[in-house]
Amino acid sequence: MTTISRNTGTEISIMIKEKRLRLNMTQKELADAVGMSKNGDRTIRRWENGETCPSQLEISAILRFPEIAPFENRKTAKYKMIDLFAGIGGTRLGFHQTEKVKSVFSSEIDKFAIKTYKANFGDEPHGDITKIDEKDIPDHDILVGGFPCQAFSQAGKKLGFDDTRGTLFFEIARIIKEKRPKAFLLENVKNLKTHDKGRTFKTILNTLEELDYEVHTALFKARDFGLPQNRERIYIVGFDRKSISNYSDFQMPTPLQEKTRVGNILESVVDDKYTISDKLWDGHQRRKTENKKNGKGFGYTLFNQDSEYTNTLSARYYKDGSEILIEQKNKNPRKITPREAARLQGFPENFIIPVSDTQAYKEFGNSVAVPTIHAIAEKMLEVLEKSKK
């Protein structure tokens, strides 16, 4: 890195700092976002202090970093949606891709997810949904949301709406009851069906039926719709029997039956900071040997360009990356990069990642398989478009 004259250095340091502040990013977040090596935040701090000067390539990377949200609402969109437990907006993105749906309300509590959401959609989600009166939520055609898997009270034998109080699913149910959206899409882990000996899933379905919605469910893997990931989730779609005439016409999308390949999401050149250390690699190998000896199936998993798909990307991936490690020739394996994690969930290349690598892994691990959402959204819109009510 070269030392520069005071005037030029001052101009560049001011430009970098002003850009970073406009983006509402820390030095660490900006360094990770533009693909700098380990300790990139220290480098940016030196640039901002005028101690050293970035190369033309580095300046260009910072200047090119987008400041305008790429997925703002389309003004011509016909249908309105709300996005609950929104995360970074993966479900909203799937509906946005239909070009027929715009968001009028969203809710999320994680400050880092909110930052990513705002950078991409241009609007900031409201906070804690439990503190928002359902009457204050705008009218909408479609409600979407993912919610944590929680056991319900078993006070009543019916297992319906009243039994859901005190859970985050209740927040969804009370909004559906008050606002009567034409349709909804809920996403959850596949274990929802067996959680609490099946009572949780039964209570959810009973509650939605009680609210007079026609309900459809399906299990899909991310690779069913073109992603090289084995992530399996349950999808619950509902239509208001009172306002949709053809609610029984809905059919879940058909899986593509296409072979996937991990190489399709991998970058050709990856910074060494993603290669795991000797200490971590030794630990992974030791634990795998111990687990095998004790009859446990847990441990790291290696993948390469030709692997058909990876394990499920989880929110804990930032810790050690053991569930998805990429083989490297004559080197320790590496973790996937945040951009590769985004691709593994089907996020487009222009999706902005304005947070640190650690937060990015959490966010994509907590998000949804966007192509699956898009496929279901198109099928839902077919029904809404043909409804005669």
Swiss-Prot record:
UniProt-listed GO biological process terms: DNA restriction-modification system; methylation
HTH cro/C1-type domain ranges (all copies): 16-71
Keyword Transcription in annotation: yes
Keyword Nucleotidyltransferase on entry: no
Active site: C149
EC number: 2.1.1.37
Stretches assigned to the SAM-dependent MTase C5-type domain: 79-387
Molecular-function GO term, any one: DNA binding
Keyword tags: DNA-binding, Methyltransferase, Restriction system, S-adenosyl-L-methionine, Transcription, Transcription regulation, Transferase
Catalytic activity: a 2'-deoxycytidine in DNA + S-adenosyl-L-methionine = a 5-methyl-2'-deoxycytidine in DNA + S-adenosyl-L-homocysteine + H(+)
NCBIfam families documented for this protein: dcm (TIGR00675)
Family from the record: Belongs to the class I-like SAM-binding methyltransferase superfamily. C5-methyltransferase family.
Extra facts: The ScrFI restriction system has two different methylases.
Protein name as it appears in the record: Type II methyltransferase M1.ScrFI
